[in-house]
């Protein structure tokens, strides 16, 4: 039989990283918020939060830290 009783709450940490490389002109538009598809960085932030918290699970989004770094010399975010 499987024990399904309450368990002690634990703190867990996960780290994920990704990089999107693009032409310098495209990167400039994305950073300036003038890309033809709208607010690319805003959508990326929301997508990251949704993936991290698995939207069906009740979790407070304040428990997540997210950072988007602009790297113009590498033509990436």
Curated annotation (Swiss-Prot):
<protein>
    <recommendedName>
        <fullName>Cyclic pyranopterin monophosphate synthase</fullName>
        <ecNumber>4.6.1.17</ecNumber>
    </recommendedName>
</protein>
<dbReference type="InterPro" id="IPR002820">
    <property type="entry name" value="Mopterin_CF_biosynth-C_dom"/>
</dbReference>
<dbReference type="InterPro" id="IPR036522">
    <property type="entry name" value="MoaC_sf"/>
</dbReference>
<dbReference type="GO" id="GO:0006777">
    <property type="term" value="P:Mo-molybdopterin cofactor biosynthetic process"/>
</dbReference>
<comment type="similarity">
    <text>Belongs to the MoaC family.</text>
</comment>
<dbReference type="GO" id="GO:0061799">
    <property type="term" value="F:cyclic pyranopterin monophosphate synthase activity"/>
</dbReference>
<comment type="subunit">
    <text>Homohexamer; trimer of dimers.</text>
</comment>
<dbReference type="Pfam" id="PF01967">
    <property type="entry name" value="MoaC"/>
</dbReference>
<comment type="function">
    <text>Catalyzes the conversion of (8S)-3',8-cyclo-7,8-dihydroguanosine 5'-triphosphate to cyclic pyranopterin monophosphate (cPMP).</text>
</comment>
<keyword id="KW-0456">Lyase</keyword>
<comment type="pathway">
    <text>Cofactor biosynthesis; molybdopterin biosynthesis.</text>
</comment>
<keyword id="KW-0501">Molybdenum cofactor biosynthesis</keyword>
């Amino acid at each position: 039989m499987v024990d399904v009783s309450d368990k002690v709450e634990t703190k867990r940490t996960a780290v994920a990283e990704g990089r999107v490389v693009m032409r310098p002109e495209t990167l400039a538009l994305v950073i300036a918020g003038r890309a033809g598809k709208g607010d690319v960085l805003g959508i990326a932030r929301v997508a990251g939060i949704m993936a991290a918290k698995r939207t069906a699970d009740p979790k407070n989004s304040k428990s997540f830290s997210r950072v988007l770094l602009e790297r113009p010399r590498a033509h990436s975010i």
